[in-house]
């Protein structure tokens, strides 16, 4: 019996000082409760921003029968858009430096679920900066337009023209061509409008008005957004 107890004691001692046991002793108990990483690597561009929109929506339900602003950073940075259109329920889903491909990719996340009464689109600026042609930008707009029509029916769709800016002045010929193609497409359709802010942002010499922009000469200041507010107001649904 004594021999059996001695053997058992040796086994216990060996286990106590084994690497596995030492590791368990040194590892905090909270390690097992560490949160699981839910964001997988290699997600498409702006995935985190879209996830943040969804998180906010889960906390506070967006207004029903709203006007949805969707597109790139010119909308994202329009943080006072609701104040600029009092009495109009606005959902602003501008994100990143998005292109038409990005908006198309996330349409199921940031357009369809809201069932808006009107969609206002600003996009194409970054597409041209990335080297896409005016015709390519036009085709991507048409794809997005057709997607919205198919899913949301005859709601009003408003396209805000691609804006000129000092930092992208060399792209102005492509901007004008893309704007013209989209304008002509919209002119042949009902429940669709083209808002020309492009020419409102040029000086008499045909250059972008410098004092409408912040230091990066790409994004707008309050003066720039005031022009947009005045141009857009007649096209918004009450």
Describe the predicted segments one by one.
Residues 83-86, 105-238:
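Alpha-helical cap/lid subdomain in secreted, periplasmic
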Residues 16-18, 62-63, 68, 187:
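A generic structural signal for short, non-catalytic loop/turn and secondary-structure boundary residues
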Residues 4-7, 36-37, 43, 68, ...:
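Alpha-helical interaction segments
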Residues 25-115:
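Serine-esterase "nucleophile elbow" of acetyl-processing enzymes
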Residues 4-7, 26, 37-46, 114-126, ...:
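Solvent-exposed, charged interface segments at domain starts and junctions
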Residues 1-28:
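Bacterial Sec-dependent N-terminal signal peptides
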Residues 6, 51, 55-59, 187, ...:
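Generic surface-pattern signal
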